């Protein structure tokens, strides 16, 4: 997520289970990999809402952080210049540089999923690689960097 986030940054997350989060374009979200089974039972949600993630979690419990580019039902197009179009409208984000790509891609987001990209587009494992992220795999919105202290800031979600 460079330049928005650094590898060592720790963020606060407004969790979906607690506050019934509505997600929008440009927001930075924390989620489980699309191949991860997510138990949506109330007991599991309660335990998960209290969890603090770390680097030592099993791979199946690792979480990722990316930016929402496509909502359920959207059509996303990335051209060879790195421009991103959502339903034929150009998306732009502050501080994110477009990077050139060798081929043009088009993605139709399923009605129960999101399309997510990292801010470091040329070096990111994101929806271009692992596919669409089901809504049940979203944990919440990242909204504040809390560590390291010199990087404390509100995250710009647009």
Cite the ranges covered by each PLM segment:
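Extended hydrophobic leader/signal-anchor segments used for secretion and membrane insertion
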Residues: 1-158
């Amino acid at each position: 997520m460079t330049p928005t986030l650094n590898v060592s940054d720790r963020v606060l997350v407004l969790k979906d289970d607690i506050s019934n989060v509505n997600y929008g374009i440009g927001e930075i979200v924390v989620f489980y990999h699309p191949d991860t089974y997510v138990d949506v039972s109330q007991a599991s949600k309660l335990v998960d809402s209290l969890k603090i993630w770390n680097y030592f979690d099993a791979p199946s419990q690792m979480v990722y952080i990316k930016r929402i580019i496509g909502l359920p039902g959207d059509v996303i197009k990335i051209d060879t210049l790195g421009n991103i179009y959502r339903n034929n409208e150009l998306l732009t984000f502050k501080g994110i540089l477009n990077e050139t790509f060798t081929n043009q891609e088009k993605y139709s987001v399923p009605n129960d999923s999101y399309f997510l990209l990292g801010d470091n587009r040329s070096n990111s494992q994101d929806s271009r690689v692992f596919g669409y992220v089901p809504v049940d795999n979203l944990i919440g919105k990242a909204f504040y960097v809390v560590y390291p202290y010199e990087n404390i800031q509100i995250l710009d979600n647009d």
